[in-house]
Regions:
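C-terminal helical subdomain
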Residues: 174-175, 190-232
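Rossmann-fold cofactor-recognition segment
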Residues: 46-61
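Conserved glycine-rich cofactor-binding loop
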Residues: 14-15
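Active-site helix of classical SDR
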Residues: 117, 151
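Residue(s) in the substrate-gating loop at a strand-loop-helix junction
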Residues: 136
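Substrate-binding pocket helix/loop in short-chain dehydrogenase/reductase
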Residues: 93-106
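Conserved NAD(P)H cofactor-binding loop of Rossmann-fold oxidoreductase domains
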Residues: 85-91
Length: 238
């Protein structure tokens, strides 16, 4: 018997880990991607059949409203998975980000996640669904990205709080990917140099992320060790 198609929202699904996750899921599930790109830029990179809503998380309230409206337009009355993957950051040497950079980082990485979790909880509860917060190993502290690290630490705390608050109604997990071969560092203004060669490829990180989501465990760190050795590589599928 074929598994039922799940209804899944993915933020930050037009590049990097998010896009690779969407590509893995699109043929088996109904996907709504939310992102900052215009429709004309986003739709060509997404698999056929994936819905898209232009919802830049730099304005968390407007983005939350746009995503909820897109779900209603699609006729969704419940939500199986909410994957809050979108993230941004700025690299600085010997200091801390500017006020504008701090506001943008916290808006995209933390405030939007809080608002989306609150707004979409009723959809998740109807499905007995899962909220997945995509953090980072940087949540333990990252010198070049202090506000980014703080925002990911905030997500870790949010996951713990919601996991207790929503117990028995909605599963909540935090997943912390390790260094991944995406455009993130370049966009942040940081060149990792030759270290980039040992970063985990985005498609392999997405495979581990899918497995972690399917397992519903929390917290989960998707590390070099798991990738290179294959140990507990989170190879399950949604």
């Amino acid at each position: 018997m074929a598994e039922a198609r799940r209804r899944i929202v993915v933020t930050g699904g037009t590049s990097g880990i998010g896009l690779e996750l969407v590509r893995r899921l699109a043929d088996r599930h109904d996907i709504l991607v939310a992102g900052r790109r215009a429709d004309t830029d986003a739709l060509p990179v997404l698999p056929e059949g994936v819905r898209y809503v232009h919802a830049p998380l730099t304005d968390p309230e407007a983005a939350t409203q746009a995503i909820a409206e897109a779900m209603l337009k699609a006729g969704w009355v419940k939500l199986d998975n909410l994957v809050l993957n979108a993230g941004t950051g700025f690299a600085v040497e010997g200091g801390i980000e500017s006020a504008a950079q701090i506001r943008e980082t916290l808006a995209v990485n933390l405030t939007a996640s809080v608002l989306l979790a609150r707004a979409l909880f009723p959809w998740l509860e109807k499905a007995g669904g899962t909220l997945t917060l995509v953090g980072s190993v940087a949540h333990t502290g990252q010198g070049l990205f202090p506000a980014y690290a703080a925002s990911k630490a905030g997500l870790h705390g949010l996951a713990r709080a919601l996991r207790a608050e929503w117990s028995g109604r909605v599963a909540v997990q935090i997943v912390h990917p390790g260094p991944t071969r995406t455009e993130m560092h370049a966009k942040a203004g940081h060149d990792p140099g030759r270290l980039r060669d040992i970063f985990i490829p985005a498609d392999r990180m997405a495979a581990m992320l899918e497995g972690a989501i399917a397992a519903r465990r929390s917290p989960v760190t998707l590390s070099f060790g798991r990738y290179w050795t294959g140990r507990a590589a989170w190879s399950g599928k949604l």
